[in-house]
Amino acid sequence: MLLPVFTLKLRHKISPRMVAIGRYDGTHPCLAAATQAGKVFIHNPHMRSQHFSTSRVFQSPLESDVSLLNINQTVSCLGAGVLNPELGYDTLLVGTQTSLLAYDIYNNSDLFYREVADGANALVLGTLGDIAPPLAIIGGNCALQGFDHEGNDLFWTVTGDNVHSLALCDFDGDGKSELLVGSEDFDIRVFKEDEIVAEMTETEIVTSLCPMYGSRFGYALSNGTVGVYDKTARYWRIKSKNHAMSIHAFDINSDGVCELITGWSNGKVDARSDRTGEVIFKDNFSSAVAGVVEGDYRMDGHVQLICCSVDGEIRGYLPGTAEMKGNLLDTSVEQGLIRELSQKKQNLLLELRNYEENTKAELSSPLNEADGQKGIIPANTKLHTALSVNLGNDAQDAHAELRISTSNDTIIRAVLIFAEGIFAGESHVVHPSTHNLSSSIRVPITPPKDVPVDLHLKTFVGYRSSTQFHVFELIRQLPRFTMYALTSPDAASEPVSFVNFIVVERAQRMVTWLNQNFLLPEDSNIQNAPFHVCFTSLRNGGQLYIKMKPSGEITVNTDDIDLAGDIIQSMASFFAIEDLQVEADFPVYFEELRKVLLKVDEYHSVHQKLSANMADNSNLIRSLLVRAEDARLMRDMKTMKTRYMELYDLNKDLLNGYKIRCNNHTELLGNLKAVNQAIQRAGRLRVGKPKNQVISACRDAIRSNNINTLFRIMRVGTAPS
């Protein structure tokens, strides 16, 4: 139970997810939040007489205890914490789409300012792995960077897509923090420094992550889903029609275990049990919640949960006291038991009513009436499921097919399928019309990504005249590479792109991997090495060849570098391979990347020219303005008018130049994203240490602008000595 202890109403709007709290003088906790017009406000109710008078910070004209920090750019992320332990107080970190600012509020000075080409969408501050100093870690355009208090770039790696959320958590229980990364490609990745140690695939963009305790962490998605993971196992999740704006871990009932606090877009704040997701506490704001943080804001020795709304309302809550703990827990347990027993009672009453109706129907109906009208089916009725590949036709695209059938003359009235990431809304209902009922149903399935998916099936079985149906529930797993059909090898269509590596495994184990990950026909006969199998993608018709020699050498031919990476990662997981070096060549993809790198150089060159032109125009504006004012003071109106007309034209040129700069920057970001993704893809072709070496060597090659070395690294995994 949370107890409200204070409410503030600031006359400043707060940007969603842009709230941080810190002791910027080492003593007093102050709230910082991004507000309108590229500013950050600092609310300091403890020292109302303190005024700032520097170029960057100024007193708010609306409130005496609020100071404004001028960023002059749209703020994209905000954080606070100890970046330099020697200072003894917290640093404010402000990220934009082009830079990162570490600001020392106590001394009103920049700790450092860094241009960040990949932007800063998310930010977290803390210690990562064995890297000794605290880092300000930012996630941007497919890249992760970590800076120390001097602005030195001590950590860099790439990830699969644009980063939306970051958190530090001891994921593997080794006493050191790992980095959790949520991105646009729906994945949560766990980095142990620059090595990916785990990946969890979700159903939407991961917008928020927060550590809870140990290896447990909370997450939120852009579709209104929130939940809790413990390592790679999901404990629970719930989905709302509203969006989760902010999540935070806080112990509201003094039981030593943090609950998941969620602030929603409709203004609701709720606290959920980390074990079950059950709502323990809720409150409401009049507008959307902007952020949830914690701190001793009243300086009374008690930590409060602090919730902020986008309209500037701030509320502080205290957790329930230890004396209340027993009563609260007892009440919660009792309520849970009552709910559970009530649900069981309802289910039993419903089942009893069905039996009574069947008995009445049996007594009132003639003895020769079909049993189907009574909702009765044979006791030995079984439900069979089979997965196969359908190559499609003119009316329907190629797809995977789930066939559900009964073992006798009963019919299937409806099928409910629950599966993550395949159907809109994560569920699909097949409900044939009355004249199309049969004992068999075929359901087309088209997974958008190559990931294994559990299909949870609920099948309603009865007779045509039945008004009640038996529900068969079962789970069927969709293999990872379902969307690939086994075809006959054709040397003419074999892709020129390949990856080549050696595994110390028997051919039978390789065949087992194929059977687990592909939908192979029952009559396929793959026995011993050497063997050669060919698949065709149902999505785009691309070819995939997998060859294995008796020596254990495996060659995978495909023009899709992402597919090659998925296959290698799948094999590494199945065969428990820790380190795998690979030789790879993707001529078409590498040529496209070469063009992208040339474009990046061009855009950088254009950016420098535009910046130089803007600087020249700025100097010219100062000169024209002085001349125009001189002419005005001398009452030379003709000259003044001429100068102001020149200023007007120059201003138009500046605006046009700004639009060109914006377009150039957008194009540059798109190409930098492609470069970062290329490095990520080259890394995914390897496993373990070779993977980390490739990513690091690729970055060094790009820094030195050595394109030929970059492609050699991507091909063979190492730079030339």
From Swiss-Prot:
<dbReference type="GO" id="GO:0034451">
    <property type="term" value="C:centriolar satellite"/>
</dbReference>
<dbReference type="GO" id="GO:0033210">
    <property type="term" value="P:leptin-mediated signaling pathway"/>
</dbReference>
<dbReference type="GO" id="GO:0043005">
    <property type="term" value="C:neuron projection"/>
</dbReference>
<keyword id="KW-0966">Cell projection</keyword>
<dbReference type="Pfam" id="PF14781">
    <property type="entry name" value="BBS2_N"/>
</dbReference>
<keyword id="KW-0813">Transport</keyword>
<keyword id="KW-0963">Cytoplasm</keyword>
<dbReference type="GO" id="GO:0040018">
    <property type="term" value="P:positive regulation of multicellular organism growth"/>
</dbReference>
<dbReference type="GO" id="GO:0048854">
    <property type="term" value="P:brain morphogenesis"/>
</dbReference>
<keyword id="KW-0175">Coiled coil</keyword>
<dbReference type="InterPro" id="IPR055381">
    <property type="entry name" value="BBS2_CtH_dom"/>
</dbReference>
<dbReference type="GO" id="GO:0060271">
    <property type="term" value="P:cilium assembly"/>
</dbReference>
<dbReference type="GO" id="GO:0031514">
    <property type="term" value="C:motile cilium"/>
</dbReference>
<dbReference type="GO" id="GO:1905515">
    <property type="term" value="P:non-motile cilium assembly"/>
</dbReference>
<dbReference type="InterPro" id="IPR036322">
    <property type="entry name" value="WD40_repeat_dom_sf"/>
</dbReference>
<dbReference type="GO" id="GO:0036064">
    <property type="term" value="C:ciliary basal body"/>
</dbReference>
<dbReference type="GO" id="GO:0021766">
    <property type="term" value="P:hippocampus development"/>
</dbReference>
<dbReference type="Pfam" id="PF23350">
    <property type="entry name" value="BBS2_pf"/>
</dbReference>
<dbReference type="GO" id="GO:0060170">
    <property type="term" value="C:ciliary membrane"/>
</dbReference>
<dbReference type="GO" id="GO:0008104">
    <property type="term" value="P:protein localization"/>
</dbReference>
<dbReference type="GO" id="GO:0021987">
    <property type="term" value="P:cerebral cortex development"/>
</dbReference>
<dbReference type="GO" id="GO:0040015">
    <property type="term" value="P:negative regulation of multicellular organism growth"/>
</dbReference>
<dbReference type="GO" id="GO:0045494">
    <property type="term" value="P:photoreceptor cell maintenance"/>
</dbReference>
<keyword id="KW-1003">Cell membrane</keyword>
<keyword id="KW-0206">Cytoskeleton</keyword>
<dbReference type="InterPro" id="IPR055379">
    <property type="entry name" value="BBS2_pf_dom"/>
</dbReference>
<dbReference type="GO" id="GO:0038108">
    <property type="term" value="P:negative regulation of appetite by leptin-mediated signaling pathway"/>
</dbReference>
<dbReference type="InterPro" id="IPR029430">
    <property type="entry name" value="BBS2_N"/>
</dbReference>
<dbReference type="InterPro" id="IPR055380">
    <property type="entry name" value="BBS2_hp_dom"/>
</dbReference>
<comment type="function">
    <text>The BBSome complex is thought to function as a coat complex required for sorting of specific membrane proteins to the primary cilia. The BBSome complex is required for ciliogenesis but is dispensable for centriolar satellite function. This ciliogenic function is mediated in part by the Rab8 GDP/GTP exchange factor, which localizes to the basal body and contacts the BBSome. Rab8(GTP) enters the primary cilium and promotes extension of the ciliary membrane.</text>
</comment>
<dbReference type="GO" id="GO:0010467">
    <property type="term" value="P:gene expression"/>
</dbReference>
<dbReference type="GO" id="GO:0032420">
    <property type="term" value="C:stereocilium"/>
</dbReference>
<keyword id="KW-0969">Cilium</keyword>
<dbReference type="GO" id="GO:0043001">
    <property type="term" value="P:Golgi to plasma membrane protein transport"/>
</dbReference>
<dbReference type="GO" id="GO:0014824">
    <property type="term" value="P:artery smooth muscle contraction"/>
</dbReference>
<keyword id="KW-0653">Protein transport</keyword>
<dbReference type="Pfam" id="PF14782">
    <property type="entry name" value="BBS2_GAE"/>
</dbReference>
<dbReference type="GO" id="GO:0051216">
    <property type="term" value="P:cartilage development"/>
</dbReference>
<dbReference type="InterPro" id="IPR029333">
    <property type="entry name" value="BBS2_GAE_dom"/>
</dbReference>
<feature type="coiled-coil region">
    <location>
        <begin position="325"/>
        <end position="369"/>
    </location>
</feature>
<dbReference type="GO" id="GO:0005902">
    <property type="term" value="C:microvillus"/>
</dbReference>
<dbReference type="GO" id="GO:0010629">
    <property type="term" value="P:negative regulation of gene expression"/>
</dbReference>
